[in-house]
Regions:
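Active-site beta-loop-alpha junctions enriched in small/polar residues
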Residues: 16-18, 53, 95-99, 131-133, ...
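Aromatic-lined carbohydrate-binding/catalytic grooves of carbohydrate-active enzymes
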Residues: 31-136
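Glycan-recognition surfaces
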Residues: 110-113, 152, 158-264
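Catalytic cores of secreted or luminal carbohydrate-active enzymes
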Residues: 247-299
Length: 385
C-alpha cells in the first residue's frame, strides 16, 4: 500500500470513446480477453477502465454507490477479479461534483466512502471527472480531497484527474497527489481536434514528469468515425486516415501523455494494431526519465512543420518531425538546434521507429520530404565521427 504509482505514463483502454453509456459486464470481460489475445497486454497496455454510466442513479440507504443491476448483475468486484485473473488492472470512473457528466451520483461529500468502496471492489485506477462542481468548492480542493481519500483507502489506486485544464490546474496538480491530469478539453475523432490539442500543449512540457503526467486525452487511433465521440452537435465529423492516426500516436508518445486506447479493440484492423503496438514508439513514451520534449521549430511557421526532441535515458534522443500542413513538405533538421555543434566531432545515428531500421549516421543536418499529416520519428544516438 502507498507504493509509488505511475512512474511512467499509464497505458490501457477506456470505454467512453467507443461505447459511451452502452457498457456491461460481458463487454468489459471480452475487452480483457482481447487485450491478451491481440498482444496489447504484451505491448504494455494494462488498465481496463470503465467510464461513466456504470452505476444506478441513486446511492443505497447507506450512501454507497451501487452498480447498475442490468449492466453489471454480479456487481463490480467480479469484473475486477476477472480482469486481474488476466494479469491486467481495473479502472473505474467517478466525478468531483454532485453528479457525473451523464447525471449519475458524483463523489462530492462522499470521497472517503467511495474510495473505500473502490478499494473493496479491487479498483486500481480512478478517472475523476469535473461535472456538476458545487459553487462552494474549487477544483484544487476537490481533487486534493479525493487524493487524500485514495491514499487512505487501503489499496494502491492510480488517480487520474480530469478537470480539462480549468482552475489553473498546471499550478497545483502535482502537489494534489494526482498521477495524471487532463489539460485539454475532450478529444474528438477528427484531425482538427488532434491538431487543436497539440497546439495547446506546445508550452506544457515543464508541468509533466514522473508520477504526474500531462494527459492529452484518450487515443482515437483506429476509431474511423465509429464511436460515441464521432459526433459534434449531432453531426458525424469523425474519422482520420491511418497516416493521421500514426502521427496522433507518435505525438502522444513524444509528449509523455498516457496511452489510453479508445477504439473497439475487438475490431482492430492490422493497421490499427501496428500503430498501437509499435514497440519503438511505446519505448519513447515509457522512457523512465519521463522528460518532456522541446520544440526546435515553432508551430506558427508558414509550413506548419515542426520537430520535437526528447532526451532519453542512457544518452539517446527521440526526434519527431511532423507535417501538419495539407501538402507534402520538406523539412531540414539542423543538429546545431538540438545541441550538437559541428565542432563536437560527432554525428547522429538515426534509427527509424516506424521502419524499424538504422538509416545511417548524419552530420550537421538531416532533411526529408514528409507527406501531409505524416511524421518521421527517430531514436538518435550520438556517435564519434
Amino acid at each position: 500500500m502507498n507504493t509509488p504509482l505511475a512512474h511512467t505514463p499509464p497505458m490501457g483502454w477506456n470505454s467512453w470513446n467507443t461505447f459511451g453509456w452502452n457498457i456491461n459486464e460481458e463487454l468489459i470481460k471480452t475487452v480483457a480477453d482481447y487485450f491478451v489475445e491481440s498482444g496489447l497486454k504484451d505491448a504494455g497496455y494494462e488498465y481496463i477502465v470503465i467510464d461513466d454510466c456504470w452505476s444506478e442513479k441513486q446511492r443505497d440507504e447507506n450512501g454507497r454507490l451501487v452498480p447498475d443491476i442490468n449492466k453489471f448483475p454480479n456487481g463490480i468486484k467480479p469484473v475486477a477479479d476477472y480482469i486481474h485473473s488476466k494479469g491486467l488492472k481495473f479502472g473505474i470512473y467517478s466525478c468531483a461534483g454532485t453528479h457525473t457528466c451523464a447525471g449519475y451520483p458524483g463523489s462530492f461529500e462522499h470521497e472517503f466512502d467511495d474510495a473505500e468502496t473502490f478499494a473493496e471492489w479491487g479498483v486500481d485506477y480512478l478517472k475523476y471527472d469535473y461535472c456538476y462542481k458545487p459553487k462552494c468548492a474549487d477544483g484544487e480542493n476537490l481533487y486534493k480531497r479525493m487524493a487524500m481519500a485514495l491514499r487512505n483507502c487501503g489499496r494502491d489506486i492510480v488517480f487520474s484527474a480530469c478537470n480539462w485544464g480549468n482552475d489553473g490546474v498546471l499550478n497545483w496538480i502535482r502537489e494534489s497527489g494526482a498521477h495524471l491530469f487532463r489539460s485539454t478539453g475532450d478529444i474528438q475523432d477528427n484531425w482538427l481536434s488532434i491538431q487543436s490539442i497539440v497546439e495547446s500543449q506546445l508550452t506544457h512540457e515543464a508541468y509533466s514528469g514522473v508520477y504526474c503526467h500531462n494527459d492529452m486525452d484518450m487515443l482515437v487511433v483506429g476509431m474511423h468515425g465509429k464511436g460515441d465521440n464521432a459526433e459534434v452537435l449531432g453531426k458525424v465529423v469523425g474519422g482520420c486516415t491511418d497516416t493521421e492516426y500514426k502521427t496522433h500516436f507518435a505525438l502522444w508518445a513524444m509528449k509523455n501523455s498516457p496511452l489510453m486506447i479508445g477504439c473497439d479493440v475487438r475490431k482492430m484492423t492490422p493497421e490499427t494494431k501496428e500503430i498501437l503496438t509499435n514497440a519503438d514508439i511505446i519505448a519513447i513514451n515509457q522512457d523512465t526519465e519521463c522528460r518532456g520534449p522541446y520544440c526546435i521549430r515553432q508551430w506558427n511557421n508558414p509550413e506548419k512543420v515542426f520537430a520535437l526532441v526528447k532526451p532519453l535515458c542512457g544518452g539517446d534522443y527521440a526526434i519527431g518531425m511532423f507535417n501538419f500542413s495539407d501538402k507534402k513538405s520538406e523539412m531540414s533538421l539542423q543538429f546545431f538546434d538540438i545541441g550538437l555543434p559541428t565542432s563536437s566531432g560527432r554525428g547522429l545515428e538515426l534509427y527509424d521507429c516506424h521502419a524499424h531500421e538504422i538509416l545511417g549516421t548524419y552530420t550537421e543536418r538531416y532533411a526529408a520530404q514528409i507527406e501531409s499529416h505524416d511524421c518521421l520519428v527517430f531514436r538518435a544516438k550520438v556517435v564519434k565521427l
